[in-house]
């Protein structure tokens, strides 16, 4: 698979052509973080947060891509099987660049979660996920171009596909409607 045809590369090219230096990974992390913290899926609120990260109002083509990205995330989080697909460079990209994007994704996620999270207490598991994301964001350059480095990257990526679901389930998933008491 060629790097230029990956969704990540296409989004990066779109952002770059519009004059934005933000990575698609950081934007996707921001969106997923705010969504998992309970921001809901209002497009206008998402576009405001994205504009802050982008450093200004996005052009229409970028705006449409951001709305599409939000629809994709909403579908992933609200489907029965709740599966997250990370917007990261493909496997043909050098490991060092993929590791940097992974760190940017974590930074974006933490920023989005922090923007939106309510003051309620989080479970120990949720706190551990946030601490893990913070640690992953800091070790971007620690992965070496080797089979072990590849394996480490894949393990971290798999963790990041699952960890946000715990936060979404705890902080944002709509509660089942309570049964209405019947009047006798």
Curated annotation (Swiss-Prot):
GO terms for cellular component: cytosol. InterPro entries: YgfB-like, YgfB-like_sf. Disulfide bonds: none annotated. Coiled coil: none annotated. It comes from the Bacteria. Belongs to the UPF0149 family. This is UPF0149 protein Pmen_0324.
């Amino acid at each position: 698979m060629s790097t230029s045809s990956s969704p990540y590369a296409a989004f990066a090219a779109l952002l770059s052509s519009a004059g934005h230096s933000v990575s698609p990974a950081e934007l996707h992390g921001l969106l997923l973080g705010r969504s998992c913290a309970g921001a809901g899926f209002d497009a206008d609120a998402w576009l405001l947060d994205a504009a802050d990260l982008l450093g200004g109002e996005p052009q229409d083509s970028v705006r449409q891509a951001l709305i599409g990205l939000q629809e994709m995330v909403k579908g992933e989080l609200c489907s029965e099987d709740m599966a997250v697909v990370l917007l990261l460079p493909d496997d043909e990209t050098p490991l060092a660049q993929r590791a940097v994007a992974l760190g940017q994704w974590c930074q974006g996620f933490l920023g989005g979660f922090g923007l939106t999270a309510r003051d309620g207490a989080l479970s120990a598991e949720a706190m551990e996920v946030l601490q893990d994301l913070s640690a992953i964001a800091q070790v971007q350059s620690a992965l070496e171009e080797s089979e072990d480095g590849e394996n480490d990257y894949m393990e971290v990526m798999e963790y990041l596909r699952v960890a946000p679901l715990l936060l979404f389930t705890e902080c944002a998933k709509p509660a089942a409607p309570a049964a209405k008491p019947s009047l006798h």
